From Swiss-Prot:
Disulfide bonds: none
One GO CC annotation: mitochondrion
Keyword field: Acetylation, Phosphoprotein
Protein name stated in the entry: Protein FAM136A
Family, similarity comment: Belongs to the FAM136 family.
Gene responsible for this protein: Fam136a
Signal listed as a keyword: no
Pfam families: DUF842
PANTHER family with a match to the protein in the record: PROTEIN FAM136A (PTHR21096:SF0)
Phosphothreonine PTM sites in chain numbering: 124, 126
Species of provenance: Mus musculus (Mouse)
Amino acid sequence: MAEVQQLRVQEAVDAMVKSVERENIRKMQGLMFRCSANCCEDTQASMQQVHQCIERCHAPLAQAQALVTSELERFQDRLARCTMHCNDKAKDSMDAGTKELQVKRQLDSCVTKCVDDHMHLIPTMTKKMKESLSSIGK
């Protein structure tokens, strides 16, 4: 049961990441590469100046990638805390003498609720991420 829930979350997060990459990150990558190419075409610049220029071109993309990574880690941490709470409740039930099958059902139900609750957060997280990405480099 937990594997099914994990797959649901993974597919939703993968779809969100693909959307963000296609609509935001890819454009930023194009800008970064074109900007870097312009740096290299400056025949008057020193090697150090070209390097600094390329670093400046890369900064918005690096900031964007850090933002996406941070948001995904935060989401993952919240989901992990929720499922840990489910595991703790299951262990407490086992310790109290509840039958294993009943504990397994409770655990599955709890994990499903965690996943359902967190699936509802994905659209808001996506919107917030895209808004933040749009403001980077402007």
